[in-house]
C-alpha cells in the first residue's frame, strides 16, 4: 500500500504494512498480527511518544548488553518483519548472538526468519538447529526450547516486543 507521507499516522501505518508483509512472507504468525494491534493501540493511548521511563529502560538495556559476557538478542517473527537490519546492527555493536525463539512454534517459520536475518547481514543465527536445542525448565510455553549456545548459555537476553512469560 502506498501511504501518503502527509497522513497523520504515516509511521504507524508503515509499520503495520511491514507486519502484514512479514505475515505474507511467512515470518509472522497470525497471532502476531493481533499482538501488534494490541501494542499499536497502547502506543496510540500513550500519545505515540517514547516515555521517560521507556528511555531509561532503553539505556539500562544498552548498558546490560554492553557489559554482558554472552549477550543474546531473541528474535520472533514480528521483530524479524519490522527490523532485521537493526537487529543485526545491534548484535554487531554489542557482540551479541542472535537467536530465533518463538511462542507459536513452527520450524518452517524459524527457517524463514533465519533466512531473513541472514539476508539482513547476520553471519550466524541460532535457534534453528534441533541438535542444539535445550529446554528451560521453568517455562511451560514453546519458548522454553532454546539453543544451547544462545539463550541457554546467555548472561543477558534482550527480548524485544515481549508480553509475558520469558521476562518475569
Predicted feature residues:
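Active-site glycine-rich loop that binds ribose-phosphate moieties when present
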Residues: 131-152, 156-167
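A short secondary-structure junction signal
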Residues: 85, 167-168
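Long, charge-dense
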Residues: 93-144
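Short His-Asn-centered micro-motif
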Residues: 74-77, 101-102, 158-162
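Electropositive, gly/pro-rich neighborhoods at or near active sites that engage anionic ligands
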Residues: 1-97, 107-109
Amino acid at each position: 500500500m502506498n501511504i501518503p507521507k502527509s497522513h497523520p499516522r504515516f509511521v504507524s501505518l508503515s509499520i503495520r504494512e511491514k507486519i502484514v508483509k512479514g505475515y505474507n512472507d511467512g515470518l509472522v504468525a497470525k497471532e502476531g498480527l493481533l499482538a501488534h494491534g494490541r501494542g499499536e493501540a497502547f502506543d496510540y493511548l500513550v500519545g505515540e511518544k517514547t516515555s521517560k521511563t521507556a528511555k531509561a529502560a532503553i539505556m539500562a538495556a544498552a548498558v546490560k548488553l554492553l557489559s554482558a559476557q554472552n549477550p543474546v538478542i531473541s528474535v520472533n517473527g514480528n521483530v524479524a518483519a519490522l527490523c532485521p537490519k537493526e537487529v543485526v546492527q545491534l548484535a554487531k555493536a554489542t557482540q551479541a548472538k542472535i537467536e530465533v525463539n518463538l511462542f507459536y512454534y513452527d520450524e518452517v517459520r524459524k527457517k524463514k526468519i533465519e533466512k531473513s536475518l541472514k539476508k539482513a547481514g547476520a553471519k550466524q543465527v541460532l535457534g534453528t538447529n534441533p541438535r542444539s536445542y535445550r529446554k528451560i525448565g521453568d517455562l511451560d510455553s514453546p519458548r522454553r526450547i532454546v539453543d544451547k549456545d544462545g539463550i541457554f548459555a546467555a548472561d543477558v537476553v534482550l527480548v524485544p516486543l515481549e508480553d509475558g512469560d520469558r521476562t518475569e
